[in-house]
Amino acid sequence: MFLTETHIQVRDMTRQFADNVIRPLAEDLDRDSRFPAEIYDQMAELGLFGICVPEEMGGPGFDTITYALVMEELSRGYASIADQCGLLELVTTLLVRHGTADQQGKWLADLLAAKLRPAYCITEPEAGTDVSGIRTTAVRDGDSWVLNGGKIWIHNAPVADLGFVLARTDPEAGHRGMSIFVVDLHAAGVTRGPKEIKMGQRASQVGPLSFDDVRLPADALLGIEGRGFHMMMSVLDKGRVGIAALAVGIGQAGLEAATDYAQQRKQFGKQIADFQGVQWLLADIAKDVEAARLLVHSAAYKIDAGLDATKACSMAKCFAGDMAVQRSSDAVQVFGGSGYIRGFEVERLYRDAKITQIYEGTNQIQRMIIARELLAKGAAA
């Protein structure tokens, strides 16, 4: 995939930021499971939030390939930081595509400037991959809505100001009975549960939210009532490209760490890079990182070109997630016992990689989507 001068400039700027600002803090953030507030604000100053928000709405106006490049470079520094960029891209895309001019004016600028931290509130105890199982409800009461229910595993829940909440507005209408509401998470009736202690990406704050008779104004409804499920699905392709790019960043960081270590570590009187077994590990990491990167760029190109990108996005997300887990494991193997010890980057990368096979749709679901697309539309590219 050939990159434009703009692509390269943004990529290199993000890479420099990751090297100089993110990577030096990554181990401390992981150890302390701390929200990276100081990095978050700097990302906003650099214009790394809402990458694809049009210029006329106050955003950078970049394409999806630029978004993928930024996600990879941020993740190469620390995946938890890339998660923030990905989350902002999801919610700003929803606002750009489905918000009224008043809603965009009310929230968009503050999201881009890091004055408001968002949460994307979909998952519930009985509704993970199967979104049709959501039980959170929003009921009309005069000119307002009353929200009741609970969400779990919500990214940013402990620190967010604004929740984009999927709720059921018509219990009899199935997927057509869901709507999205923009909720002030400091409002009366909103309760935050304890922060989850996670295996990886520990600086990403995740926790439950509960809503007890939370009264919402009429303009909290985003888009058209009953279209919430379809609105959510409309941003999934871009979300999957983002997670795939994040996974590529993990793989790239592991490749760099393993290559450097193999040339420094000596056993039996020579560098371990001289041993064929280690060389094969490095070669396998390198080829799969590059293959995943090309799948990501291909999927991003299709989104930007207005082509049907569903299969391409699922292929990129599935392959890149599996790659990140397997090849970060290989990077640990190159390090040997050192790779199993906290404080070595590859140990963190291995833990950070696992979630890329799970969120934004499990890789089993991605395989189902790929097969469904093949069987419905044929195997021709």
PLM features: residue spans?
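Alpha-helical interface subdomain recognition
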Residues: M1-A82, G86, H98-Q103, D110, ...
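Flexible, glycine-rich active-site loops centered on histidine and acidic residues
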Residues: T92-H98, Y120
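Conserved hydrophobic/aromatic beta-strand scaffold that supports enzyme active sites
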Residues: A119, G133-T137, S144, L162-L166, ...
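A short core secondary-structure module
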Residues: D143-S144, N148-R192
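Short Gly/Pro-enriched turn/cap motifs at secondary-structure boundaries
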Residues: Q84, L111, E126-T129, W153-N156, ...
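A short, Trp-centered hydrophobic/proline-enriched beta-strand micro-motif
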Residues: A114-I122
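Short, charged, solvent-exposed linker or helix-capping segments at domain edges/interfaces
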Residues: G177, R192-P194, A218-E225
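Flexible, small-/acidic-enriched active-site or ligand-binding loops
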Residues: G133, H186-P217
